[in-house]
Amino acid sequence: MRGNFLIFILFCSSLYSEVIDDPFEGFNRATFEFNESLDRNFLKPVAQAYSKTPKLIKKGVTNFFNNLEEVETSVNQLLQGKPLKAINDLSRFVINTTVGIAGVFDFASKIGLVRHEEDFDQTLALWGIPSGPYIMLPALGPSTVRDALSRPFTSFLSVTFHMTEADVNLVLK
């Protein structure tokens, strides 16, 4: 009797086992191995060297890159129907780019302008576009199909996408 019950339980549990399908499994596994190698051989040594950088300089670098994201965030706020947040984020960019010396200092936060993070993937999600399957992107890591397809638009909105060598030289002088 006990044996029949055990067989019955095993049979029932196999009926309801869920098969999780990864349509990009081969690509994802190969890309994961590539990313692991990239991390081990390049990114980890760079990160270890950067960890020795003084906190004040790290904060300035973080502020600089956060400032560059403000324009993209502002556009996505508009696309999501949040005009007041868009004005806030664009104001942050103008203030931090000018008074904050190219965004190295975050004066906008000091005067009460809150930092937001929005990207085109979030905009597409708000519009009802499903995320799609998981995908591992080379050098960028885990993502979804929606996020991966939103990245070119996000890059186009990035300030750095539109910078020329002359712009960089002007800033560095």
What are these regions (language model features)?
Residues R2-F8:
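Sec-dependent signal peptide recognition
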Residues E18-K173:
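Amphipathic, glycine/alanine/valine-rich membrane-attaching segments
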Residues C12-S17:
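N-terminal signal peptide c-region/cleavage motif recognized by signal peptidases
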